[in-house]
Amino acid sequence: MGHNPPHCKCNYPAFAMTPLKLGIPKGSLEEATIALFAQAGWRITPHARNYYPDIDDPTIRCALVRAQEMARYVARGTLDLGLTGLDWILETEADVAEVCTLTYSKASNRPSRWVLVVPEHSPIERVEDLAGCKIATELVGFTRRYLAERGIEAEVEFSWGATEAKAVEGLVDAVVEITETGSTIRAHGLRIVADLLITDTRLIANHTAMADPARRTRIEQIALMLKAALAARQKVALKCNVPADKLDAVVALLPSLHAPTVSHLYDKHWLALETIVDATAVRDLIPSLCAAGAEGILEYELRKMV
């Protein structure tokens, strides 16, 4: 009881008895990553007492891993694939396969920036002014290489947190910190001197896993669905009814992926129109559609877009 017969046919890939080991970033990206997987079709359920969330897919096993360490574990083969930032791939110099870019973060669907920050009244105006200075950052390896490539000698020390405060309190001359908008930095009386790195989330995989045809196929399927979920966040669907004699005027307003779908209604003088548009365009587009003669306008969110 409870076991499949020897010749049972299953719908899962041949490697189902050895599931893919997927790393979910623990910490600031955790909630956003689980939400992205949910939109893509996978329900991941974390547990308070361990680091191994449940997932409703027998071909995958999950582990919560710090984003800073993810690339190292994927490179070793401890994990087959995982999600982490480009910044931590570069920091660890891990040899991994980058499957796809997924531009999302804890608070938005845009990249983050590692920036050089100094107190507002600091004499440092450019990166070259860092010669002989003391810099605090969590991204030590990358920062040292960045400066070395430009022939700048400076002391770079690891920061365990509250990095911005070190610059405010005068403990260091500058910090290299991550930000999405820069608002917190400015609120602390600090000034951004330069952007050092634009970073976003990457789905990475172990080279051995990618060399296996079945595992590679499954990894690429996961990537496809995650990208489809992210793409859908930027778009909405619009449906409306349009008088036949005003169709051309309405269609001219639509920045569609392709030509909009137009179908006939029972009343031959009216047509139904459906299209996909940028979510940010709707606030201006709907009033324009109304003015052009469209009626019964409906807007609805998309879950995936391939």
Across the structure, where does each feature detected by a protein language model lie?
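Small-molecule-sensing regulatory modules
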Residues: 11-59, 64, 84-113, 121-306
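Short, structured active-site "lid" loops
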Residues: 59-80
